[in-house]
Swiss-Prot record:
Subunit structure: Homotetramer.
GO terms for MF: chorismate synthase activity; FMN binding
Function: This reaction introduces a second double bond into the aromatic ring system.
Keyword Lipid biosynthesis: no
The protein's name: Chorismate synthase
Cofactor descriptive note: Reduced FMN (FMNH(2)).
Cysteine pairings via disulfide bonds: none
Gene name as annotated: aroC
Gene source species: Anaeromyxobacter dehalogenans (strain 2CP-1 / ATCC BAA-258)
GO annotation terms (biological process): amino acid biosynthetic process; aromatic amino acid family biosynthetic process; chorismate biosynthetic process
CC annotations in GO: cytosol
InterPro entries membership: Chorismate_synth, Chorismate_synth_AroC_sf, Chorismate_synthase_CS
Domain of life (superkingdom): Bacteria
Length: 381
């Protein structure tokens, strides 16, 4: 069994819900760790007013007993406190309020309304909103729990806000991770964070928004997770697809993937072996992936987030109802959400890694999966 899930819910609806299937029985779930990731997603310099309203927490409804997975589908919900302020506008039982027709460039509003034959883009934007990533993060926390049991850890770091970008080539150390988690910009360099805050403040003052980039890392992965056999089984393709499925992510880089101007001997990673360490590399330009499979080095992927298209200083658009020129409608939004996106990035990467590991090692009980991973690691040494 591999992992799969479905989610439902609107940004200002009663709740975001998910059903996940495929987790082996006996996995210990730390509910506080799940809620901690939800709180991490709410943090970040440049966030909007919504995060002052919500206090996100996951309510588990099925698939666990006494903090352990049972092997049955897991159901969970993240409730929207802000629904109380929107219940007359966003309700399964009635339609109210002014129609949203001043569609916003950069959003799903126009294409979604035309595709589904809607005269009110509210039905599009409520589902397309990045608010849905709250339940994504809760699902990712479950995947992290499975990965941790198998010796794999996932973390992230913001590496760019606006044009100011850094290129760390290794996962953060424990001390750096502590600094990252303490930072309102999810970075371990306070001088750099101060520069970034100034950029965010400048965009806020002009009624704009600003994007950036983040790295996601995974350590402890064995060699050979993923496959070279078919394109849809290549782990790099799956990770890129998962990250590009996150709202506002426009590009993904694996390792030093954009540095293709280097000659080959400066781009690839020489292979070494010794009995104690097994196979190893002294560089990690590939970012832990070769030929669609993990190569035993730390995974490193970078995702690029566009500036949020909802802005106080709006762009020109067309009214969906009249086809007349107008200004895009403003909805409460963030100036910068890159730190939050990094936490979402962790979640989707963790999910894909957990799925790929279960594909390879199988098992209906966690202990079966763990033993299979250990036996494989011993074989390839």
């Amino acid at each position: 069994m591999t992992l799969r899930y479905l989610t439902a819910g609107e940004s200002h609806g009663p709740a975001l819900v998910a059903i996940a299937e495929g987790f082996p029985a006996g996995l210990a779930v730390d509910f506080e760790a799940v809620d901690r990731d939800l709180r991490r997603r709410q943090k970040g310099y440049g966030r909007g007013g919504r995060m002052k309203i919500e206090t996100d927490a996951a309510q588990f409804l099925a698939g666990l007993r006494g903090g352990l997975t049972t092997g049955a589908p897991i159901a969970l919900a993240v409730w929207n406190k802000d629904h109380e302020n929107w219940k007359d506008l966003v309700s399964p039982y009635a339609r109210g309020g002014k129609k949203f027709t001043q569609v916003r460039p950069g959003h799903a509003d126009l294409a979604g309304a035309l595709k589904y034959g809607l005269d009110d883009a509210r039905d599009v934007l409520e589902r397309a909103s990045a608010r849905s990533t709250a339940v994504t993060v809760a699902l990712g926390a479950l995947a992290k729990a499975l990965l941790s049991t198998l010796g794999v850890e996932v973390c992230s770091r913001v590496v760019a806000i606006g044009p100011r970008e850094i290129r760390p080539d290794a996962p953060p150390t424990p001390a750096q991770r502590d600094a990252i988690e303490a930072s309102d910009l999810h970075v371990d360099d306070e001088a750099l964070a101060a520069e970034w805050r100034a950029l965010i403040d400048a965009e806020k003052a002009r009624g704009g928004s600003i994007g950036g980039a983040f790295d996601v890392y995974a350590t402890g992965l064995p060699i050979g997770v993923g496959s070279h056999v078919h394109p849809d089984r290549r782990l790099d393709a799956r990770l890129a697809g998962a990250l590009c499925g996150v709202q506002a992510i426009r590009a993904v880089e694996i390792g030093d993937g954009t540095q293709v101007g280097r000659p080959g001997y400066e781009f690839h990673d020489a292979i070494h072996h010794d009995p104690a360490r097994g196979f190893w590399r002294d560089t990690n330009r590939a970012g832990g992936l070769e030929g669609g499979m993990t190569d035993g080095m730390p995974l490193r992927v970078r995702a690029y987030m566009k500036p949020i298209p909802t802005m106080l200083h709006p762009l020109a658009t067309v009214d969906l109802a009249t086809r007349a020129a107008t200004q895009a409608r403003y909805e409460r939004s963030d100036v910068c959400a890159v730190p939050a996106a990094a936490v979402v990035g962790e979640a989707v990467v963790a999910w894909e890694l957990a799925n790929a590991l279960l594909e390879k090692f199988g098992g209906d009980a966690v202990e079966d999966v763990r033993r299979a991973v250990e036996a494989y690691a011993a074989r390839i040494r």
